[in-house]
C-alpha cells in the first residue's frame, strides 16, 4: 500500500460491511491470511494501483496473484476509460502475461468517449464486468450494461 489513507479507507468499508480485513505487504503473507479466512466464500484482495512499466511493481503483483491457486482466483483489471487507447493496450498486454482477467472501467462520468471500452474488449477478449461513474461508493458502481454503452457509442443518452 502506498496511497495516503488507503488502508484506513478500506478499513472503514470493512467496518460498515461488518467483514474482516487484513493488510499484507507481500505475497509471502498471503498463505497465512488465506488459512485464517478459509471459511469465507469470497475473499477480496485489493492491490494498490501500480505502473505497468515498473518491473518490480509488476513482479510484486504477479507474486501476489500466483500465491492464490488458479481455481480460486478471479482477477479484475481496473482501467480508466479516459486513458489513451495505446496505453490501455500496453497495460492489458502486460497483465495478460500474468493472468486472465475481467475488465472494470472507471470514470465513465468524466468522458463522452466510450469507444475504448469496446476496443479493449475486442483486443483482449476479456469479459466486461463492472463500470464506475462517480465518486460515491457503492452507489456509482454497476455491472457493465452493454446496451447502455452501445447507445452512448452511437451518440445517444448524453
Where are these regions (language model features)?
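Conserved phosphate-handling catalytic cores of large alpha/beta enzymes
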Residues: 129, 133-158
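Short, surface-exposed amphipathic charged segments that create phosphate/polyanion-binding patches used
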Residues: 35-39, 119, 142-149
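Inter-motif core of Ras-like GTPase G domains
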Residues: 35-45, 57-82
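Conserved ATPase-coupling elements of RecA-like P-loop NTPase cores
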Residues: 6-7, 52-58, 87-89, 113-116
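Cytosolic-facing regulatory segments adjacent to core modules
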Residues: 22-34
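Conserved beta-strand/loop subsegment of P-loop NTPase cores
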Residues: 45, 71-79, 96-133, 138
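Conserved nucleotide-binding/hydrolysis micro-motifs of P-loop NTPases
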Residues: 1-4, 28-29, 49-52, 81-85, ...
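P-loop NTPase switch/communication element
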Residues: 1-24
Amino acid at each position: 500500500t502506498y496511497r495516503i489513507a488507503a488502508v484506513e479507507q478500506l478499513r472503514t468499508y470493512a467496518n460498515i460491511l461488518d467483514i474482516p480485513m487484513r493488510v499484507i505487504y507481500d505475497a509471502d503473507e498471503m498463505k497465512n491470511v488465506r488459512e485464517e479466512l478459509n471459511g469465507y466464500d469470497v475473499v477480496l484482495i485489493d492491490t494498490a494501483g501500480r505502473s505497468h512499466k515498473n518491473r518490480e511493481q509488476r513482479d510484486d503483483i504477479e507474486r501476489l496473484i500466483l500465491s492464490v491457486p488458479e481455481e480460486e482466483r478471479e482477477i479484475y483489471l481496473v482501467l480508466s476509460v479516459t486513458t489513451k487507447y495505446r496505453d490501455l493496450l500496453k497495460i492489458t498486454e502486460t497483465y495478460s502475461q500474468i493472468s486472465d482477467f475481467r475488465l472494470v472501467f472507471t470514470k465513465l462520468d468524466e468522458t463522452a468517449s466510450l469507444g475504448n471500452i469496446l476496443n479493449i474488449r475486442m483486443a483482449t477478449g476479456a469479459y466486461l464486468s463492472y463500470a464506475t461513474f462517480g465518486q460515491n461508493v457503492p452507489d456509482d458502481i454497476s455491472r457493465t450494461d452493454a446496451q447502455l454503452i452501445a447507445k452512448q457509442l452511437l451518440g445517444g443518452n448524453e
